[in-house]
Amino acid sequence: DLWWLKQVAPMAEYFPTHILKVSMAWSVSKCKYSFQKMMSMLEPLSKVDIIDQMRVAYEYFPMENKDVDFQFPVLILVGKKDSTGKVKTYCKEWAKRTGYPLHYIKGAKHFSNGDNPEQVNKEIEDFINRIIRKERK
């Protein structure tokens, strides 16, 4: 897996800038709103900026965060239709290994808060309320 992650940034260099941005936006978006929002976030970035961010996300992040132990409550949300790499697989394994709750966002890809904001907000609200109730006991 790590070898493939290191290939993402070099492969992106072969894409024309506009095609790179459009393909990235659609790959994480299920609905038009999310696509447009993602395009607006990518718009000010140059191809070099995007590739630098890919390098951080795909090459460095997995190594730097492999043994992280959070000392606060964690909720894992993942789009039911997320097809970004192995995100769903990794989230499932992370939840299994740590006991963190994992919730799937219906009809959503990787940009799940844009694809289904109602469910994302409800999941977060319910999570916070469970923590508050637990602390009051």
Spans of features found by a protein language model:
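Conserved alpha/beta-hydrolase catalytic His-Asp/Glu region
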Residues: 13-71
